[in-house]
A protein has these predicted regions:
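Terminal targeting signals and extreme-terminal segments of soluble enzymes
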Residues: 1-149
Length: 149
C-alpha cells in the first residue's frame, strides 16, 4: 500500500485510509472506513468506489506474488448484493484464482460486518517476462557512489 500512496493519483485518493490486515502470496485482506467521499447521491456506498476496490484489491493480490508491476485490466465485473453506508467498515478479501503466463484472474469479496456487499472478478494482463526483466534491471543497477567521504 505504501507504493500506491507514494504514486498518488486516483487510487491513493480513494484508499488513503486503507489498512492491510493480511498479505500472503495470492491472498490479501484489508479494511477501510466508509466516509462521505465514498457515497452516492442517496447515501449508499458508491458502486464506482466498490468497483475500484475490486480493481485495487485484485491488483494487490497479484502484487503479493512478487510482481513489481501488476499489468493492465482486461476485464472487471462486479455484482452489488447489499447496501452499506457512511460509518460502516468495509473489509475486502482478494485472491488470485489463477496466475497464467500472460493473464491473472482474481476474485474480490467485499463485506460490511457479516454482510456480503459486493463480489467481483478482475482479470489482468500481467506480462510476466516484462516484469522479470524490470526486476532484473533494477537489481543490476549499481548503487550510487558515496560522495560524503
Amino acid at each position: 500500500m505504501q507504493a500506491v500512496h507514494a504514486r498518488g493519483g486516483f487510487d491513493a485518493f480513494c484508499f488513503d485510509k486503507l489498512n492491510l490486515l493480511l498479505a500472503e502470496v495470492g491472498h490479501v485482506r484489508g479494511e477501510i472506513p466508509v466516509t462521505r467521499d465514498y457515497l452516492n447521491a442517496v447515501g449508499g456506498t458508491h458502486g464506482g468506489w466498490l468497483s475500484t476496490l475490486v480493481d485495487v484489491g485484485g491488483s494487490l493480490a497479484i502484487a503479493s506474488h512478487g510482481f513489481k508491476t501488476t499489468g493492465v485490466s482486461t476485464d472487471l465485473s462486479v455484482s452489488f448484493l447489499a447496501a452499506s453506508g457512511e460509518g460502516s467498515n468495509i473489509v475486502f478479501d482478494a485472491r488470485v484464482l489463477k496466475l497464467g503466463r500472460t493473464l491473472a484472474y482474481t476474485r474480490v469479496d467485499i463485506f460490511s460486518g457479516d454482510k456480503l456487499v459486493a463480489t467481483g472478478n478482475h482479470t489482468k494482463f500481467v506480462a510476466r517476462e516484462q516484469d522479470r526483466a524490470a526486476q532484473e534491471a533494477a537489481a543490476e543497477k549499481p548503487a550510487p557512489a558515496n560522495t560524503s567521504e
